Swiss-Prot record:
It comes from Bos taurus (Bovine). It comes from the Eukaryota. The keyword Zinc-finger applies. One of its GO terms (biological process) is DNA-templated transcription. Its main location: nucleus. It is found in: Nucleus, Nucleoplasm; Nucleus, PML body. Belongs to the THAP1 family. DNA-binding transcription regulator that regulates endothelial cell proliferation and G1/S cell-cycle progression. Specifically binds the 5'-[AT]NTNN[GT]GGCA[AGT]-3' core DNA sequence and acts by modulating expression of pRB-E2F cell-cycle target genes, including RRM1. May also have pro-apoptotic activity by potentiating both serum-withdrawal and TNF-induced apoptosis. The keyword DNA damage does not apply. A zinc finger (THAP-type) spans 5-57. Keywords: Cell cycle, Coiled coil, DNA-binding, Metal-binding, Nucleus, Transcription, Transcription regulation, Zinc, Zinc-finger. SUPFAM superfamilies: Glucocorticoid receptor-like (DNA-binding domain). This is THAP domain-containing protein 1. A motif (HCFC1-binding motif (HBM)) lies at residues 134-137.
């Protein structure tokens, strides 16, 4: 009797030229045999001493390496099945289930409250108000400080210009003073031994210096 695979849809038969091995159901080990029967998933299938499963339905770790993958391990169970036997259509027919009642037109109060909570802004509690006010004060203070800093920078720039002008005037006054000293010295030498001498200075030797406030 030619060995063939008992798996549903599998057409493998023993052929010495094909690298496919066949393994009989472990009838002497009922617990393991039931696992094989459950894995096959064939209705009303009872294996006999001639029933077998081909090696294509076992994963590589189910075989013993020392036996060139020809013998199964003691606890090996077939798990690869591409086809399964279709179920009886009568069993697939399910009893009509009761239809759930239609949803009410008016949503529950809890849903209405939740929707209102999403649409309405949160109530301004004292804590929220204080945080909001503090935030506004912080923004206003920052803007005021920036404006004040800008004003101070402008004032500093003006004072720098005034200081530069005053320094220039001071240098001019120093030069005029040096000229005045030279004139006085010259006049003294000219008068010689006279007890009192008079010096007539030109008008351009004097300049009114305005000190910035």
């Amino acid at each position: 009797m030619v060995q063939s695979c008992s798996a549903y849809g599998c057409k493998n038969r023993y052929d010495k030229d094909k690298p496919v091995s066949f393994h009989k159901f472990p009838l002497t080990r009922p617990s393991l045999c039931k696992k094989w029967e459950a894995a096959v998933r064939r209705k009303n299938f009872k294996p006999t001493k001639y029933s077998s499963i081909c090696s294509e339905h076992f994963t590589p770790d189910c075989f013993k390496r020392e036996c060139n993958n020809k013998l199964l391990k003691e606890d090996a169970v077939p798990t690869i099945f591409l086809c399964t036997e279709p179920h009886d259509k009568k069993e697939d027919l399910l009893e009509p289930q009761e239809q759930p009642p239609p949803p009410p037109l008016t949503p529950p109060i809890s849903q209405v409250d939740a929707a209102i909570g999403l649409l309405m802004p949160p109530l301004q509690t004292p804590d929220n108000l204080s945080v909001f006010c503090d935030h506004n004060y912080t923004v206003e203070d920052t803007m005021h400080q920036r404006k004040r800093i800008h004003q101070l920078e402008q004032q500093v720039e003006k004072l720098r210009k005034k200081l530069k002008t005053a320094q220039q005037r001071c240098r001019r006054q120093e030069r005029q003073l040096e000229k005045l000293k030279e004139v006085v010295h010259f006049q003294k030498e000219k008068d010689g031994a006279s007890e009192r001498g008079y010096v007539i200075l030109p008008n351009d030797y004097f300049e009114i210096v305005e000190v910035p406030a």
